[in-house]
From Swiss-Prot:
<comment type="function">
    <text>Dimethylates a single guanine residue at position 26 of a number of tRNAs using S-adenosyl-L-methionine as donor of the methyl groups.</text>
</comment>
<keyword id="KW-0819">tRNA processing</keyword>
<feature type="binding site">
    <location>
        <position position="106"/>
    </location>
    <ligand>
        <name>S-adenosyl-L-methionine</name>
    </ligand>
</feature>
<keyword id="KW-0808">Transferase</keyword>
<dbReference type="GO" id="GO:0160104">
    <property type="term" value="F:tRNA (guanine(26)-N2)-dimethyltransferase activity"/>
</dbReference>
<protein>
    <recommendedName>
        <fullName>tRNA (guanine(26)-N(2))-dimethyltransferase</fullName>
        <ecNumber>2.1.1.216</ecNumber>
    </recommendedName>
</protein>
<keyword id="KW-0489">Methyltransferase</keyword>
<keyword id="KW-0479">Metal-binding</keyword>
<keyword id="KW-0820">tRNA-binding</keyword>
<dbReference type="GO" id="GO:0002940">
    <property type="term" value="P:tRNA N2-guanine methylation"/>
</dbReference>
<keyword id="KW-0862">Zinc</keyword>
<feature type="binding site">
    <location>
        <position position="254"/>
    </location>
    <ligand>
        <name>Zn(2+)</name>
    </ligand>
</feature>
<feature type="binding site">
    <location>
        <position position="237"/>
    </location>
    <ligand>
        <name>Zn(2+)</name>
    </ligand>
</feature>
<feature type="binding site">
    <location>
        <position position="234"/>
    </location>
    <ligand>
        <name>Zn(2+)</name>
    </ligand>
</feature>
<dbReference type="InterPro" id="IPR002905">
    <property type="entry name" value="Trm1"/>
</dbReference>
<feature type="binding site">
    <location>
        <position position="105"/>
    </location>
    <ligand>
        <name>S-adenosyl-L-methionine</name>
    </ligand>
</feature>
<dbReference type="InterPro" id="IPR022923">
    <property type="entry name" value="TRM1_arc_bac"/>
</dbReference>
Length: 367
């Protein structure tokens, strides 16, 4: 079937039958992801004018790479499958675009050549591509993970094996998954004396997506490692805290209710977005994008999120406290009136971030 996104029209496998067992995988749900990718590429080229080359490392139908080529990037589309590379060539020709199509193992290509921007968007975990992607990237590495159950702690052992961290299935599980992914990528880059800093990240529709800007040198890589640490969380009263470092030192019990705490990590505790870059990406969202309104709304929320490592869900808190929920704007305003920083988050309509702890939140928002 044919699909139009942005400035291009491509042929993709029939859906919904296509999946991991199909010859060429295409996910229509990821149109928002691809729209934001195009906007991010436009914004990054303005941020770093010397960049020009882009690798779609796991191309499949090639829709992401074709869209990059339509935005004047010197694009390489890579896939190990014959049907996929044939489809990539067909889709480039259909749109009268020039790009290089490579039938290759993505890891082999990324170990042998380097690109200004590398995009790794596989089915499932990106970790099998992580080392090669770091070595094959000059400036910006874009990564998608769709294995949200391991990332978020729902499939605990798989998460530990894949990401080298202890994930926990908390009420902020989407953010947990994002920060576990970032931790794994930051640690991978640091092994090569590279600082990989997220300038845009979001957890949307059962996937996590991040854009990591590279800086080279042992010192800056060490600075990134310093932003890893652990979150300690109480499942009973929802209290949580975090500390930095690669050695966990959790409190013995919850300081509020004295119940047992769960510890997750090492995860990324630093910023997941650069607000200035997020704003620049939003300005590059254009009307021909099918998810333009949704993308702008998401980016506006991301840009306004305060910098704390976890978020809360008002409905879950109020249920624990035995009181009714209220309008989010009113709830957040109460926190601000009490002197705390607070913002909505993109993780859900009833989620928020604040520098208040769970006891302070309850007191500040009481009637």
């Amino acid at each position: 079937m044919r699909v139009s996104e942005g400035r291009v029209t491509v042929t993709v496998p029939e859906q919904p039958e296509a999946g991991k067992g199909a010859d060429v995988f295409f996910n229509p749900v990821q149109e928002l992801n691809r729209d934001i990718t195009v906007a991010a590429l436009r914004a990054y080229r303005e941020r770093t004018p010397r960049v020009s080359t882009y690798l779609d490392a796991t191309a499949a139908s090639g829709i992401r790479g074709v869209r990059a080529a339509a935005n004047d990037w010197e694009t390489t589309l890579c896939d190990i499958d014959d049907d996929a590379t044939a489809l990539c060539e067909q889709n480039l020709e259909r749109n009268d675009l020039a790009a290089s199509v490579r039938r290759s193992d993505a890891n082999v290509l990324m170990h042998s050549e380097a690109f200004d921007v590398v995009d790794v968007d596989p089915f499932g975990t990106p970790i099998p591509f992580a080392d090669a992607a770091v070595q094959g990237t000059k400036h910006l590495l874009c990564v998608t993970a769709t294995d949200t159950a391991p990332l978020c702690g729902a499939h605990f052992e798989s998460g530990v094996r894949s990401y080298g961290a202890v994930p926990r299935n908390t009420e902020f599980h989407a953010e947990m998954g994002m920060r576990v992914l970032l931790s794994a990528m930051v640690r991978t880059a640091a092994r090569y004396d590279i600082a990989a800093r997220p300038i845009l990240s979001h957890a949307t529709k059962h996937y996590a997506r991040t854009y990591l800007e590279f800086d080279h040198g042992a010192k800056v890589a060490n600075d990134c490692i310093d932003e890893l640490g652990y979150v300690h969380h109480c499942q009973h009263c929802l209290w949580r805290d975090h500390d930095y470092g690669l050695i966990a030192d959790p409190p013995e019990d919850c300081p509020v209710c004295e119940k047992h705490l769960q510890t997750a990590g090492p995860i990324w505790l630093g910023r997941t977005c650069d607000p200035e870059f997020v704003s620049a990406v939003s300005e590059q969202v254009s009307e021909e994008m099918g998810t333009a309104d949704e993308a702008k709304e998401l980016l506006a929320t991301l840009g306004a999120e305060i910098d704390t490592p976890t978020h809360y869900d008002q409905h879950r808190l109020c249920k624990r406290w035995g009181r009714g929920a209220e309008a989010m704007d009113e709830f957040i305003e109460k926190l601000r009136d009490a002197g705390y920083a607070a913002s909505r988050t993109h993780y859900g309509g009833t989620t928020f971030k604040t520098d208040a702890d769970v006891v302070e939140i309850r007191e500040a928002t009481a009637d």
